[in-house]
Structure formats: structure tokens, C-alpha cells
């Protein structure tokens, strides 16, 4: 038997993105967003409303980074979604995060979060709240690599459970993509 919930924002895993951009004075700001993902090979799409300070900053600077929130920084990443940059201009400082300027786009990279997708703005539609960025680079700290490749266990990204308003860390490897299903060919 199944239980029907009606229309919900229930997709698993739902990523927890930390989106960062500079304001017109070069001050870094960031926010937590869960509605987003890869929309084309070198594009990322995120749904964020135009009243966010981060949205304003992205529209001004034409660039942003998307870091994966991690289990080590759940509280800090949650705070970035609770506090408004319109009211708290030093959110990153308050939660202890530090930034460096991306080598590839005019946007901040958060040092404490080991993976960042560095993007240039392609478009923003205020009606649908859809922001689209061209992926220019993905940078990953050595602490999240094994043999030069991203190690998901070391990265320890979290996902958002919209039913229960919880965060969960991604689990163990269960198979090999584009390989395990070959037995059915």
C-alpha cells in the first residue's frame, strides 16, 4: 500500500547548496538553497527568489559559486539559510567561514567547504525564480580526494529531507554506474 501526499518538493537526495557571490563593494555573501541541480552538461540551475541578497549580488556581479554543504558544517550551512543577508551583512564571518576569490570567476570560494562549482550567470527569470549558471570550473580541496578523484565519503555532502526538515549525510557506495546493470543486456 502507498500513502499519497499530493504535490510536494520531495526528491531524494535533495542537495544542500551554499551559493556565494560578491556584492557591489566586493563583500562576500552566501545562502543555503536546496532546489537545484545540473540542467545541462555545463550548466547548473537553482531556484532562488529575487528578494535574496545573494540573488541581487549574482545579478550585479554576473558570477557565483555553489559549494556542497557538508556534515562537518551542518550548523554553519543551516545558519546561512536562516539569516538574511539583507539584514545580516556579515553572515559568513558570524558562522566562521572564510573566503578566497575564485581563480576563474568573480565570486568567493568558501575555504571550509571542500567542493565548489564556479559559475558565470547565464540567465535569471524572476517569475520562475530560475537562475542558470555556466559551469566554468569545479574546485575540490585535497582533503576530499583519493587518488586524484572526488571521494564522496571524504566530501561528506549532506542532503535535505523536505518531508521532515532534516539533513542527512549521503551514504555508502552501493554499486558501479554504467556497469552493474550490464547483466540485463
Residue ranges and their predicted role:
Residues 1-185:
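Basic, polyanion-binding surface patches
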